[in-house]
């Protein structure tokens, strides 16, 4: 008897709830909308947009299209784990890029900054002497040595060496050597060059001195002038030196003469 009453009560409540729902204004509005649309879901068919009237859907992984002009009206739903919701750390990347650029610029300036190229005159390496007795001329082939040091972190080319020998305010010999050698980074090379000289004309009196048999050493003082031209990265640099040197005009000499009166640096 109790079960029957419970069932009847539940059925009665169901009918009353349904009547209350159907009589509500919201339900009537929904029924009105359905009646206008015919109650058929075919009013919302699947439409594929192609061509210029559509754009790529940003949340469809490039496989869908949406009508053009509705980009600001449609709302895209993406998963919470999507990469686009994560912070891009733009400031961190920009700061790291700036620090890396500054480091590279500092290294480039350090290694490419031009440093000095040192030229050290070693001395006279050898002297070959010959005479012209009839014309009272003294010929001297003077071979000199230079130490050229490259203090840069890149190679430099020794383009040419210009040398002059001067005796008693008169230039008695000069030479020019081109395309000599290449010096590596932080390296040093010794270069030998020969200057042919002639003592004649108003200095013919030196013939008697150089051929005098009563003395063994016939030293004369000459001024050596050298200009070394180096090239790196298309830039030419010149280093000049002047020094006074003893030269024996009385006979051939093969020993290195390291002594000089002074070695002032002029370039």
From Swiss-Prot:
Alphabetically sorted, this entry's keywords are:
Cell membrane, Disulfide bond, Endosome, Glycoprotein, Lysosome, Membrane, Signal-anchor, Transmembrane, Transmembrane helix, Transport
Q: Where are the transmembrane segments?
A: 93-113
Record's GO cellular component, any one? Answer: plasma membrane
Q: List the disulfide bonds.
A: 210-249
Instruction: Name the Gene Ontology biological process terms.
Output: dendrite morphogenesis; lysosome localization
Record keyword Aminoacyl-tRNA synthetase present: no
Pfam families to which the protein is assigned, alphabetical: TMEM106 (PF07092), TMEM106_N (PF21002)
Enumerate the glycosylated residues: 141, 147, 160, 179, 252
Membrane-protein topology? Single-pass type II membrane protein
The residue spans the entry assigns to the Cytoplasmic side of the membrane are as follows 1-92
> Which sequence ranges are listed under topological domain Lumenal?
114-267
Task: Output the superkingdom of the source species.
Answer: Eukaryota
Q: Does the keyword Transmembrane helix apply?
A: yes
Location(s), subcellular: Late endosome membrane; Lysosome membrane; Cell membrane
Can you tell me which family this protein belongs to? Answer: Belongs to the TMEM106 family.
Function of the protein? In neurons, involved in the transport of late endosomes/lysosomes. May be involved in dendrite morphogenesis and maintenance by regulating lysosomal trafficking. May act as a molecular brake for retrograde transport of late endosomes/lysosomes, possibly via its interaction with MAP6. In motoneurons, may mediate the axonal transport of lysosomes and axonal sorting at the initial segment.
The name this protein goes by in its record: Transmembrane protein 106B
Species assigned in the record: Danio rerio (Zebrafish)
